[in-house]
Amino acid sequence: MKMDWLKGLMRLRAGTIIAASAGVCLAVCLLALLGVFIVQSASTMTARAVSGIEPDWQVQVVGTTDAESADVAIHSTVKTKSLYKVDYADVSSLSSTIDGTTQTTGVGKAVGLDEGYANNNPRQFRLLSGSLDGVLLAQQTASNLHARPGDTVTIARLGQAAIDVKVDGIIEVSNADQFFQIIASTPQTALNAPPDNIIFLPAPQWEAAFASQLDSMPQTSQRQLHVSFDHSVLPGDPTQAFVTATEMANSLAAKLAGGGVTANNLAARLDGVRQDSLFSKVLFLFLGTPGAIVAILLTMLIVLSGSDRRKRDIALLQMRGASRSEILSMSGIEALLVGAIGAVTGVALAAVLAPIFVSSAMNTAEYYWFAAAGLSGIFASLVVFLIPSWLALRNTALENTVQPRTLAYLAPTWQIFGIDILLLALAWFIFWQVSSTGYQVVAAPEGVATATVDYKAYAAPAFLWAGSALLLMRLFSLFMRHGRNVLEQVLHPIAAVFSKTVSASLSRESGRVTKGVVMVALAMSFAVSTAIFNTTYENQAKVDATLTNGADVTITGTTANPASPLLDTILKTVGVANAEPMQHRYAYVGNDLQDLYGINPSTISAATSMSNAYFGNNDAAATLTSLKNSPDGVLVSDETVGDFQLKEGGVINLRLQFASDHAYHIVPFKFVGIAREFPTAPKDSFLIVNAAYVAAKTGLPGSEIVLIKSSVEPPTLAASLHDITKNMPGLVISDISEAVHRLGSSLVAVDLHSLTALELAFALPLAAGAVGLVFALGLAERRRSFAILQAIGATPRQLGAFLWSEALIVYVAGTAAGLAIGWLLAWMLTKLMTQVFDPPPDVMVIPWSYIAILCLTGLIAVCIAVLFQLRKTSVSLSTAMRTI
């Protein structure tokens, strides 16, 4: 019997089975590919995180343990790529005498480096002038001492006579906060600020000068081993990689037996990334799951479109004595057939498409996702088929045969209890609760950050989507039942004299028409929200990279070797759209040394983005105008305002270094506003001023940095500019593609480009399918009505009035509602992610071209459905009557 039933399904309902299987196929394929993106993004985040770690471990030798014993323990624990000894010693001061003037710093650090450390760690040590071999001065220390390569610096040792050393190079220590972190047996909540005055010595020279201090005053000196090892042993998932990195450090601790303390830089980075990895999973699922839900709903619509026929089938089986379990098993056969076909084709399609959207090979975790997606498709198919059958079995055979007539509208249970209003209220409550606290990003000095996300925030958009759909169903059903006069006026241009008849017919079919409108709205909202959010996300990721790098291409020099003399040559270079000089100096606010950036407020935005979020009043134009109108104006950070109790319009005295004597002198400025972010600036505190005013006061007209806006690919332009700067010592060129995000890096570094392409590619057929299929299935249910109209003499034009009128209602209402819901969803998700972005977006980016294509695709789909139905109405009257 079951085999006969299966053969009958294949013979008589092949079209329905294929259509339903196609819906399951789309859902399975989308879920499987989402799994691929989740796994790939996690691996990418892990790879990016560990690639920037130098070193992985900083092992501080303590007690009686010597460096050689610790070296043996390290090599037995990990496969090392490099291991260098680094010694630290406190010094009373550094001083130099240049041109008859002596400059003396405060306390500082003298660091001993093994041979090759500086040369082999370009991310840690950036050469500005001279050579990396020999004695090196940190950039700010060199500036304070007015020292250049070849000059002599005096080191005042603790409890010993001062010594003189000859400077060989000036460097920038890129990750000084990590390099000089305090290593303790208990984890530190934040890294300490690095010392202001730093000098690096070759290891033998440091040993000769400070070995006795290391033995006699261990509290003022330390010995560390900086270790980098092979990362291939780390799993791709950040959480598992974090566990592995922690276990390796624990193994080393056991071998050292108290003889060393490890700063696990690798685990610290992965600890933050694992939070972001979970965020990306939620984000990907949130962006893609609605598409799978729409595909399943379309499958459900296909199944329910034949509900009357299925009830008659069940009635026939009931009259022939089939039991409930037998009837359900037959429905289950159909469900399994549809689910199996959809699951197999969906997984196969995902396997074909995966190499197009992701570059790396498939792994075990992705195959698990494929299996889970296939099983989910089969489960969804069982639910879609078995629930209607189970409900039908609650009726008698007669009740399943006779179409019930409802004289009065009966509100569904969800409307009576206001589930739509409840969902919307929950959405806005969660949104208010989360957005009021936001995503709290805890930043260490100089922008080392770990991001944590309140994942319940994603319940808000989910509730909004479901609640909006139900509210639309409530309101549109109400309109269709009670707005007949308005409907008649709306349809008059199409139906003409038949508008009253058509509106009355549609009003009687309000339930079916409303479901069609809601389905179209859901499909459209998925496409629109995905397009808007992903476009905004990608645009903001570029803004974040610009904030880090400064511009598309940035040339960075020093006060002694500024980049600004090359400005005219840069502007003539092919591919340069614009270029702006920017000073980067240092200024004392009280005793606090801060970065100072001198700009031309009128033209800075021509070379780099000036986001509203950069400034305290959220108005970039107004803030820059205020700075322009106040030549002595200064923008300060929130931290500085609080620390020094500043009032807008008040005077703030800064100490700047003058060219005349290389000493710091007081220069008065007027506080005109707050800067929260600025291109290339650190996160904690900095100053923005007029470059012309600083140049006039200090006698130093040059600008250390040139920001360049590119009209070609930034890496291409950067390569061209290398020819210009190759003979200029200390100038470094960086382009936006090299930018490493210092705040929230893993979050906005997640590349949504391929995921966007996938989702938008799926959204088009889903939207077209929703519009065309909903309308076509609705007309199929009305075959009897059209046959009767033909029987009583209705002309093709009159039948066309019914068809085009319903098409207008379903398409226009569904599309308009979908656009509104989609925009609202994208707005909410963007707002919820405001503090994840650095800086947050000023406005959402609307992909108008895609939305136009989306609407046009839906229009074409509904036109095809109408024309197909009109063709079917041209059959003979006898053929039409056989459909009654």
Model features per residue range: what roles?
Residues 12-41, 277-315, 336-345, 416-430, ...:
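Hydrophobic alpha-helical transmembrane segments of multi-pass inner-membrane transport and secretion
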Residues 39, 342, 346, 350-358, ...:
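Juxtamembrane/transmembrane-helix interface segments of polytopic membrane transporters
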